C-alpha cells in the first residue's frame, strides 16, 4: 500500500510507516496528479483540494483529512469515482474551546467586560459549539444557541433564531461548517444585513471558516462602531488575508484555534484508525503529544492560570508583525497543550 501524507501532520510517521509499504510526505499545497497517480490513499489537511483535477485517473481509493472541516474534498466527485473519504469530527473541539475561553478572559481584562453579565450567542452547536457552550456556562455567561439543522432534526425549543441572537447577544461566535449553497448555506452567513441587526457594541468571533463572514461587511461594522471588537482566526482568501481587518481586530490569528497538540494528536489518530478500518489492517500504536516543560501552574486566579497555559495574544502579535508569514506561522506552530496536561493550583 502506498500512502501520500501531508508533511505537516504531526505524530504520524512512526505509525504510518508500520502500516504502509511506501509513504511519501509532501506539503499539502504540492499534491499534484502526478504525485497521487499510483497512491492507494491520501492523508491530508485543508490545503489539499481533492477533486477531479487531482484525482482523475489515479488509483486513490481512500482519503483521510486530519481536520474537522471537509469543504476541500469534492464529496460528489469522490462518490462518483468510488473513493471513500473521512474527516476527524470533534478532534480539536477542546482546543477551540480553550482559544475561546482565553479570548474571553482577554476581553474581560482589557475591555472591562464583566463576563457574568454577558450573553453569548453560539452559531453552530456541533462538537465544537457544544464545548464552547460548556466553557461559557462555566464562566457564568448566559448562553443562546443557534443551529438550524439540529433545530429541525430534533424539533427542539433550545435553539434561537439568528435574528434573535443578533439582537440580544453581547458576543457572537461562529462554529459552523462551510456550505456554499443549499438550505443550510453558511457562506456569508454574517453579511451586511446581519451586522446591521446587531446589538450595538457587540463582539464577533470566528474560528470556523473564513467565508462564513463577509469581510467587507465585517470591516464596515468595525469602522462604524456597530462592533466593539472582533476575534478572527479564519479568513477569507487565506493565506492572503485582509490587512485592514488584521489591524482592526483585537485578536487575529493564522487559523490555529484548533492547533493544540492534543487536538492534532486526536486528528492523526482518527485518520490512521479510519485508514486501518478501510484497508482491514490490524495494528497497535499510541499517539501522544509531548509533555509541557512546566506542568505545575500556580497562580492567584483561574483566569491567570488559563492565560498562562495559552494566551492567543502571542499568536496574534506574531501574525500582526508578519502577516506575509501566515502559512509559516501555521505550519511551524509551537507546542501548545490543553488544560488537562497541567496541574493547576489556585493560591488566592
From Swiss-Prot:
Alphabetically ordered keywords of this record: Cytoplasm, NAD, Oxidoreductase, Pyridoxine biosynthesis
The catalytic site is made up of 209, 238, 255 (proton donor)
List the signal peptide residues. Answer: none
**InterPro entries named among the record's database cross-references:** D-isomer_2-hydroxyacid_DH, D-isomer_2_OHA_DH_cat_dom, D-isomer_DH_CS, D-isomer_DH_NAD-bd, Erythronate-4-P_DHase, Erythronate-4-P_DHase_dimer, NAD(P)-bd_dom_sf, PdxB_dimer_sf
Specify which residues bind NAD(+) according to the UniProt entry for this protein: 147, 233, 258
GO CC terms, sorted: cytosol
Enumerate the catalysed reactions: 4-phospho-D-erythronate + NAD(+) = (R)-3-hydroxy-2-oxo-4-phosphooxybutanoate + NADH + H(+)
A Gene Ontology biological process annotation?
A: pyridoxine biosynthetic process
List locations, semicolon-separated: Cytoplasm
Q: What is its EC number?
A: 1.1.1.290
- Pathway recorded for this protein: Cofactor biosynthesis; pyridoxine 5'-phosphate biosynthesis; pyridoxine 5'-phosphate from D-erythrose 4-phosphate: step 2/5
**Amino acids binding substrate:** 46, 67, 259
Molecular function in Gene Ontology: 4-phosphoerythronate dehydrogenase activity; glyoxylate reductase (NADPH) activity; hydroxypyruvate reductase [NAD(P)H] activity; NAD binding; protein dimerization activity
Q: What intrachain disulfides are recorded?
A: none
What Pfam families would the database entry show?
2-Hacid_dh, 2-Hacid_dh_C, DUF3410
The entry's function note states: Catalyzes the oxidation of erythronate-4-phosphate to 3-hydroxy-2-oxo-4-phosphonooxybutanoate.
Q: What is the similarity comment for this entry?
A: Belongs to the D-isomer specific 2-hydroxyacid dehydrogenase family. PdxB subfamily.
Which NCBIfam families does this entry report, sorted A to Z?
PRK00257.1
* Quaternary state and interactors: Homodimer.
Protein's UniProt name: Erythronate-4-phosphate dehydrogenase
Organism equals Bacteroides fragilis (strain YCH46)
Amino acid at each position: 500500500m502506498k500512502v501520500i501524507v501531508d508533511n505537516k501532520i504531526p505524530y504520524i510517521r512512526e505509525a504510518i510507516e508500520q502500516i504502509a509499504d511506501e509513504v511519501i510526505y509532501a506539503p499539502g499545497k504540492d499534491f499534484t496528479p502526478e504525485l497521487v497517480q499510483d497512491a492507494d490513499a491520501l492523508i491530508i489537511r485543508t490545503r489539499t483540494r481533492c477533486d477531479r483535477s487531482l484525482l482523475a485517473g489515479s488509483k486513490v481509493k481512500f482519503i483521510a483529512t486530519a481536520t474537522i472541516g471537509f469543504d476541500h474534498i469534492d464529496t460528489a466527485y469522490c462518490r462518483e469515482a468510488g473513493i471513500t473519504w473521512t474527516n476527524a469530527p470533534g478532534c480539536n473541539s477542546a482546543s477551540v474551546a480553550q482559544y475561546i475561553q482565553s479570548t474571553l478572559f482577554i476581553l474581560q481584562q482589557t475591555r472591562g467586560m464583566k463576563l457574568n453579565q454577558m450573553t453569548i450567542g453560539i452559531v453552530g452547536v456541533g462538537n465544537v459549539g457544544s464545548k464552547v457552550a460548556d466553557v461559557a456556562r462555566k464562566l457564568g455567561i448566559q448562553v443562546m444557541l443557534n443551529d438550524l439543522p439540529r433545530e429541525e432534526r430534533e424539533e427542539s425549543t433550545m435553539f434561537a433564531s439568528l435574528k434573535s441572537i443578533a439582537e440580544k447577544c453581547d458576543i457572537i461566535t461562529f462554529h459552523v461548517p462551510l456550505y456554499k449553497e443549499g438550505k443550510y448555506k453558511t457562506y456569508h452567513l454574517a453579511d451586511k444585513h446581519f451586522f446591521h441587526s446587531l446589538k450595538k457594541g457587540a463582539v464577533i468571533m470566528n474560528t470556523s471558516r473564513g467565508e462564513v463572514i463577509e469581510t467587507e461587511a465585517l470591516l464596515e461594522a468595525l469602522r462604524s462602531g456597530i462592533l466593539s471588537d472582533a476575534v478572527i482566526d479564519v479568513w477569507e482568501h487565506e493565506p492572503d488575508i485582509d490587512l485592514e481587518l488584521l489591524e482592526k481586530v483585537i485578536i487575529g490569528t493564522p487559523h490555529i484555534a484548533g492547533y493544540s497538540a492534543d487536538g492534532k494528536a486526536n486528528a492523526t489518530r482518527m485518520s490512521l484508525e479510519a485508514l486501518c478500518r478501510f484497508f482491514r489492517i490490524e495494528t497497535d500504536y499510541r499517539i501522544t503529544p509531548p509533555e509541557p516543560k512546566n506542568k505545575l501552574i500556580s497562580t492567584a486566579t483561574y483566569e491567570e492560570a488559563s492565560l498562562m497555559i495559552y494566551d492567543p495574544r502571542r499568536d496574534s502579535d506574531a501574525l500582526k508583525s508578519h502577516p506575509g508569514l501566515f502559512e509559516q506561522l501555521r505550519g511551524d506552530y509551537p507546542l501548545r497543550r490543553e488544560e488537562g496536561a497541567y496541574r493547576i493550583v489556585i493560591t488566592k
